[in-house]
């Protein structure tokens, strides 16, 4: 882990930053250096790759993925950790299909995820977050969509999203299916969570993008189900 030191001379300031092993020679002046008992630092993270389509910057990979064709990790809506199974019994906000969730319900009136419950934001930092329903809609309006069973000879099926005005701008959403007691429908169905809850008065459900073959739907799956996450970079 690299460490950074600022050297302060009487009337000016010298700074040196590097991620590599290096040595520095300071000007021939006297200086003093205050060293605190504790040093707090934020790691320098490389920028996450993205493609800009329809005025929004979309990550090229899912949360937990190592490549665009990797499905990555599955998360229940509003949860920030993976699990061995996804059910109402172990859902973070509790409840069941009839309601009773402790947050994002008809009482608190919250209509989108708080950042503390947004795994994209917590994983990537900065302005990264889970997209809203409207942002996914804008993406699809600005692009053409094509189902493929073998994206770029990878053997992975999913949805290819190509910018209507620049066909070099392409997103691929792997068809990762869904996760309950196990993973189902990989390669045939894709689900991706929005940050928006569903229709008012139905707090047990949340909006998601759903695609299979040539069809694109917008169902309201149960919030406990595990889906992949495709982040967006906010302003």
Regions found by a protein language model. Give the residues of each.
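C-terminal, surface-exposed recognition/capping segments
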Residues: 38-235
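Extracellular/surface-exposed low-complexity repeats and stalk/linker segments enriched in Gly/Pro
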Residues: 1-29, 33-37, 177-181
């Amino acid at each position: 882990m690299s460490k950074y030191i600022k050297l302060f001379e009487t009337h000016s300031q010298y700074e040196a930053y590097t991620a590599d092993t290096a040595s520095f020679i300071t000007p021939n002046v006297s200086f003093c250096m205050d060293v605190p008992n504790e040093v707090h630092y934020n790691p320098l993270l490389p920028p996450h790759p993205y493609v800009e389509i329809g005025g929004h910057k979309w990550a090229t990979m899912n949360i937990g993925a190592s490549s665009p064709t990797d499905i990555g990790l599955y998360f229940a809506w509003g949860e920030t950790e993976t699990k061995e199974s996804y059910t109402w019994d172990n859902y973070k906000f509790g409840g069941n299909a009839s309601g009773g969730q402790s947050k994002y319900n008809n009482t608190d009136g919250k209509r989108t995820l708080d950042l503390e419950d947004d795994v994209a934001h917590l994983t990537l930092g900065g302005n990264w977050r889970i997209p809203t329903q409207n942002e996914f809609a804008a993406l699809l309006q600005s692009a053409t969509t094509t189902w493929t069973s073998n994206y770029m000879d990878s053997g992975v099926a999913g949805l290819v999203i190509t910018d209507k005005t620049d066909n070099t701008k392409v997103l691929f959403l792997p068809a990762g299916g869904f996760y309950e007691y196990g993973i189902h429908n990989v390669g045939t169905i894709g689900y991706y969570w929005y940050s928006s809850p569903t229709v008012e008065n139905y707090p047990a459900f949340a909006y998601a993008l759903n695609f299979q073959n040539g069809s694109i739907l917008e169902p309201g799956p149960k919030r406990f189900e595990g889906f992949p996450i495709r982040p967006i970079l906010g302003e």
